[in-house]
């Protein structure tokens, strides 16, 4: 009877996406994970040595379940991440690591200023790696149950890293979501792409900048980085540009974009290279516009955020000596989740299909805003600016 009760309890625990996690249910979960680890081929000694000491981390649960109270604009995101301080520090790191970076460029085809940009955005050039024990974070997220299968796999991958001797468990710390080291790799990415470039017998992404930068280069090469291409560039859009041509579903050759009137910010013609690109306008028609090349999508293989990809590309440009954007991104009104939900409801009621009314300003909501703008003779850029929000009735 006791065994049957335990099995029923475990089934209910793992099948419920949002059950509160307490010490008792966490202990039951760890008991199940021990057997699952054995079934996955992990040695009993490794499981016992490390799972016996894992602890429930309530902060991790809180962070995983929390949602931002307000929307965050591209201007906020970009300004924080591509700051003058980060640019200057990136240039210093590029100079001090130049010999290594040139070697990595020859080996992997990734220009050094891009590697330094990833390094800067992920951990401020190794300055802050996160201080949450990785096993505690991954075990907590596994047992919380919302994405249990994914985090169970990452927990077992972390145990394999410890089994290989790349890091001591006391040093295996990182973000609340389990990202680790100077490049903030998840364990699965670590196992596939971490490199022992300094030759000390360990893939040490915590203490060795050389290993970390080489690992980033290996990952980007595997994602399909094109050696001779840049990430993209800022461009100037002509008056009357059709913003329905933006986005990755509308890739065109540079020659085609030039025919449509696109130029460099100073008015010079676009390069004549044989490549395709998409137009990205993260802050609407009053903000900067970018052509995104193949390597832009490679950057999104590291982090799926378009804003992140632009930040990496522009930080790399600035580290290499480029100037600031010709057009600074404008601030968008800060909306709370209730306001975004109301916006989605109004757009849906008017037939513009914003999708689920969840209070999150995602791509579906942006497309619905563009449809509203087009129907009301506004510039249909999908940007939630003050004018459109006032006309819809979200702002006074």
Residue ranges and their predicted role:
Residues 293-306, 314-359, 395:
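Acidic, Ser/Thr/Pro/Gly-enriched interdomain connector segments
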Residues 15-17:
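N-terminal signal peptide c-region/cleavage motif recognized by signal peptidases
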Residues 335-340, 348-392:
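Short acidic, glycine/serine/threonine-rich helix-capping segments at coil-helix boundaries
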Residues 31-47, 52-59, 106-109, 120-124, ...:
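Sec-exported extracytoplasmic/periplasmic mature domains
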Residues 76-221, 231-232:
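Acidic/His-rich structured neighborhood in mature extracellular/periplasmic domains
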Residues 21-108:
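An acidic, Gly/Ser/Thr/Pro-rich helix-cap/linker signature
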Residues 47-70, 119-123, 133-136, 234-239, ...:
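Acidic helix-start/capping segments at beta-turn-to-alpha-helix junctions
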Residues 169, 176-181, 186-301, 309, ...:
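Flexible, glycine-rich surface segments
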């Amino acid at each position: 009877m006791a065994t049957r009760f335990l099995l029923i309890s475990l089934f209910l625990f793992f099948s419920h996406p949002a059950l509160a996690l307490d010490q008792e249910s966490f202990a039951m979960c760890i008991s199940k994970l021990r057997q699952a680890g054995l079934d996955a081929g992990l040695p009993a000694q490794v499981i016992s040595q490390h799972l016996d000491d894992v602890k429930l981390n309530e902060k991790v649960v809180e962070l995983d379940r929390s949602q931002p109270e307000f929307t965050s604009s591209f201007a906020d995101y970009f300004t924080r991440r591509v700051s003058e301080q980060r640019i200057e520090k990136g240039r210093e790191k590029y100079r001090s690591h130049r010999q290594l970076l040139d070697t990595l460029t020859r080996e992997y085809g990734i220009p050094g200023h891009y590697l330094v940009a990833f390094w800067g955005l992920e951990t401020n050039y190794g300055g802050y790696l996160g201080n949450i024990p990785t096993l505690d974070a991954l075990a907590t997220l596994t047992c919380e149950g919302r994405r249990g299968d994914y985090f169970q796999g990452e927990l077992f991958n972390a145990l394999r890293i410890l089994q290989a001797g790349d890091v001591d468990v006391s040093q295996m710390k990182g973000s609340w979501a389990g990202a680790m080291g100077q490049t903030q790799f998840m364990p699965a990415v670590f196992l596939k792409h971490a490199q022992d470039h300094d030759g000390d017998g360990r893939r040490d992404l915590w203490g060795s900048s050389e290993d970390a930068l080489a690992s980033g280069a290996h990952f980007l090469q595997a994602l399909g980085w094109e050696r001779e291409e840049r990430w993209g560039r800022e461009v100037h859009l002509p008056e009357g540009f059709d913003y329905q041509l933006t986005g990755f579903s509308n890739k065109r050759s540079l020659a085609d974009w030039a025919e449509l009137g696109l130029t460099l910010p100073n008015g010079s013609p676009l390069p004549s290279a044989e490549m395709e690109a998409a137009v990205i306008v993260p802050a609407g028609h009053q903000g900067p516009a970018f052509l995104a090349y193949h390597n832009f999508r490679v950057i999104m293989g590291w982090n799926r955020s378009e804003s992140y990809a632009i930040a990496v590309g522009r930080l790399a440009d600035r580290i290499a000596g480029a100037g600031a954007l010709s057009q600074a991104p404008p601030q968008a009104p800060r909306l709370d989740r209730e306001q975004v939900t109301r916006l989605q409801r109004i757009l849906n009621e008017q037939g513009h299909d914003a999708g689920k009314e969840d209070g999150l300003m995602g791509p579906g909501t942006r497309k619905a805003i563009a449809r509203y703008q087009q129907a009301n003779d506004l510039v249909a850029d999908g940007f939630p600016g003050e004018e459109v929000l006032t006309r819809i009735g979200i702002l006074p």
